[in-house]
From Swiss-Prot:
It is found in: Membrane. It comes from Mus musculus. The modification Phosphoserine is found at residues 320, 351, 426, 505, 641. This is Phospholipid phosphatase-related protein type 3. One of its GO terms (molecular function) is phosphatidate phosphatase activity. Gene3D superfamilies: Phosphatidic acid phosphatase type 2/haloperoxidase (1.20.144.10). Glycans are attached at residues 167, 316. Residues 312-321 have a biased composition (Polar residues). Residues 437-459 have a biased composition (Acidic residues).
Length: 716
């Protein structure tokens, strides 16, 4: 059954097995055998001649004939080759029969068959040829090394003088006067014995026997299993003792000196160890080529389910946040919680929808993972800091900046009115065409989206949605509007001191007002009607200034108007139609310092008043207001005075007029005469038209802004 398993394995194809054996390994072994023949069995190579002492007793030992030796050379070669080779063949046969039991435990495993040259070579044949062939080559190499050293050294054997039979008379001198002889004075007739007497170091018997013993002992240690406790030691000791006996016989029979035998043992053992470790790989099977198996795919659903809710609750804040939330979102100002939907397409489950929530708060019940789309979605409450419910706004009051903004507004108004001037008598026609409003809304929405993306890239957006209101005991609330980077808010500033003709005061100031307006009318060319094809340019210095500032900023236009007129918990979530239409904030744009908010009694709207410094003039805007100056001081307008006190005073030039553009309160009737003020009345009418158009645009922009805010809040 085990053999069938080995046979059932698909044999490997080798293109280099036979070529290497025939053209590399076999020629090397054959050449070594041929060389050994010339060195051992012929006199082609003669040893070196070394001198000796006269009558040296160490070289005068008896000579034992070759046929009388205990282990002759041919017997040694046959034993050194036959015994190890037979042992290797028997061992390989047993391994082939029991290869699963013996080799299955080894690091190399079991060798399979190989197809080469149309022949199938099983593991028994290949291993036997490999191990025996290396052993034969080792024997030849050891004999060659021994012969080369013997020929190079030429040391004498203990029986050299016995077979040499030196003739000392040929020296011409006595041995006493010249004891060391270097001349060839041998008179013996056995030339072969004399040549063999000059080759003793190292002992050939010792080298060959040591090589065979070490090589086969290493084979036994590698192949025989540890279950047989005594077989391996017996075989190893048997070959080791045989090698020792071969060497010792050379000493006892005076064939070699003891040092020659010891050197032969070392040389033979070294060659055997080298070939066994490097030529045959310590008799182990070569490592099988393992096909890399792909790593098993990780089941995402199983990994998530293993993380139970209890383990998530037990984690501390840092671990939970690091695992589920990216580090970039944990820094800076808190942001609304964002859900990261992980794609789990590999699960192939239609009824499973995994939402990974990434809260910035410590892990709790609100941070658990739900695995069913039938369960309610869990989301963390929005972390609204009370400080985020307020903001500080700075309204720039630079005269040069105001001129620049008004110039841009004039250009836009000219382009908008070039299509056609609506009827002045009907306030309904003050609206711009629906297509133009839609286009402007789309452009503003794109600008707002770009600005929001830039702010998100730059860093956390500061909480700036509402102004900070400070309560002052006895003086009323005060709104502080510090500067902030970003789009300028829209502040509603009413037109300046133009009211109905019946409201003019009979005091001395009214005459100066009438004189100034008449001079303005004369400079403007008198009450000449403007054709519809020629656009008229009105210069309301305050209303258009703030509208131009909001248009140039391109940001949310209705944030300040809603936040400054109501508390921080209502106006953000209401649409413009639901809010109080009478909540209007009035402010003097030419105030030298921050404006002061005056809260009227009851539920009346706030009005922003500013202290007017006497002697401070305003800037000139356009041709119609070129002669305008503001130098009078309004009595009774202190920082803490209520609106009711101011409203009871008679109107003056430069007073603040509250006009509700949404309801139309404060506007003169459509058919009001222009005789009292002339060009000033037309200018007031034109300002109302522009104000109505701006109000419609503000409402449209506010609706789009709150719609986006509401959608974003739903997403969060």
């Amino acid at each position: 059954m085990l053999a069938m398993k080995e046979k059932n394995k698909t044999p490997k194809d080798s293109m280099t097995l036979l070529p290497c054996f025939y053209f590399v390994e076999l020629p090397i072994v054959a050449s070594s055998i041929v060389s050994l023949y010339f060195l051992e069995l012929t006199d082609l190579f003669k040893p070196a001649k070394v001198g000796f002492q006269c009558y040296d007793r160490a070289l005068s030992m008896p000579y034992v004939e070759t046929n009388e030796e205990l282990i002759p050379l041919l017997m040694l070669l046959s034993l050194a080759f036959a015994a190890p080779a037979a042992s290797i063949m028997v061992g390989e046969g047993m391994v082939y029969c029991l290869q699963s039991r013996l080799w299955g435990r080894g690091p190399g495993g079991v060798e399979g068959s190989i197809n080469a040259g149309g022949c199938n070579f099983n593991s028994f044949l290949r291993r036997t040829v490999r191990f025996v062939g290396v052993h034969v080559f080792g024997l030849c190499a050891t004999a060659l090394v021994t012969d080369v050293i013997q020929l190079a050294t030429g040391y004498h054997t203990p029986f050299f003088l016995t077979v040499c039979k030196p003739n000392y008379t040929l020296l011409g001198t006595s041995c006493e006067s010249n004891p060391y002889i270097t001349q060839d004075i041998c008179s013996g007739h056995d030339t072969h014995a004399i040549l063999s007497a000059r080759k003793t170091f190292p002992s050939q018997h010792a080298t060959l026997s040591a090589f065979a013993a070490v090589y086969v002992s290493m084979y036994f240690n590698a192949v025989i299993s540890d279950t047989t406790k005594l077989l391996k030691p017996i075989l190893v000791f048997a070959f080791a003792i045989a090698a020792g006996v071969c060497g010792l016989t050379q000493i006892t029979q005076y064939r070699s000196h003891p040092v020659d035998v010891y050197a032969g043992f070392l040389i033979g053992a070294g060659i055997a160890a080298y070939l066994a470790c490097h030529a045959v790989g310590n008799f182990q099977a070569p490592p099988a080529e393992k096909v890399p198996t792909p790593a098993p795919a990780k089941d995402a659903l199983r990994a998530l389910t293993q993380r139970g809710h209890e383990s998530m609750y037990q984690q501390n804040k840092s671990v939970s946040t690091d695992e589920l939330g990216p580090p970039g979102r944990l820094e800076g100002v808190p942001r609304p919680v964002a859900r990261e939907k992980t794609s789990l397409g590999s699960l192939k489950r239609a009824s499973v929808d995994v939402d990974l929530l990434a809260p910035r708060s410590p892990m709790g019940k609100e941070g658990m993972v739900t695995f069913s789309n039938t369960l309610p979605r869990v989301s963390t409450p929005s972390l609204d800091d009370p400080a985020r419910r307020h903001m500080t706004i700075h309204v720039p009051l630079d005269a040069s900046r105001s001129r620049q903004l008004i110039g841009e507004w004039k250009q836009k108004s000219l382009e908008g009115r070039g299509l056609g001037l609506p009827d002045e008598a009907s306030p309904v026609h003050l609206r711009a065409p629906a297509e133009q409003v839609a286009e402007e809304e789309e452009e503003e929405e794109e600008e707002e989206e770009e600005e929001e993306e830039e702010e998100e890239e730059e860093g956390p957006v500061p909480p700036s949605l509402y102004p900070t209101v400070q309560a002052r005991p006895g003086l009323g609330p005060r709104v502080i509007l510090p500067p902030r980077p970003g789009p300028q808010p829209l502040v509603h500033i009413p037109e300046e001191g133009v009211q109905a003709g019946a409201g003019l005061s009979p005091k001395s100031s009214s005459s100066s007002v009438r004189a100034k307006w008449l001079s303005v009318a004369e400079k403007g060319g008198g009450p000449v009607a403007v054709a519809p094809s020629q656009p008229r340019v009105a210069n309301p210095p305050r209303l258009l200034q703030v509208i131009a500032m909001s248009k140039a900023a391109g940001g949310p236009k209705a944030e300040t108007a809603s936040s400054s007129s109501a508390s921080s918990d209502s106006s953000q979530y209401r649409s413009p139609s639901d809010r109080d239409s009478a909540s209007i904030v009035t402010i003097d744009a030419h105030a030298p310092h921050h404006p002061v908010v005056h809260l009227s009694a009851g539920s009346t709207p706030w009005e922003w008043k500013a202290k007017v410094v006497e002697g401070e003039g305003s800037y000139e805007l356009g041709d119609l207001a070129r002669g305008f100056r503001s130098s009078c001081k309004q009595p009774g307008m202190g920082p803490g005075s209520p609106v009711s006190d101011v409203d009871q005073e008679e109107p003056r030039f430069g007073a603040v007029a509250t006009v509700n553009l949404a309801t139309g309160e404060g506007l003169p009737p459509p058919g009001a005469s222009e005789g009292a003020l002339g060009a000033g009345s037309r200018e007031s009418t034109l300002r109302r038209q522009v104000g109505g158009l701006a109000e419609r645009e503000v409402e449209a922009e506010a609706e789009s802004y709150y719609r986006r805010m509401q959608a974003r809040r739903y997403q969060d």
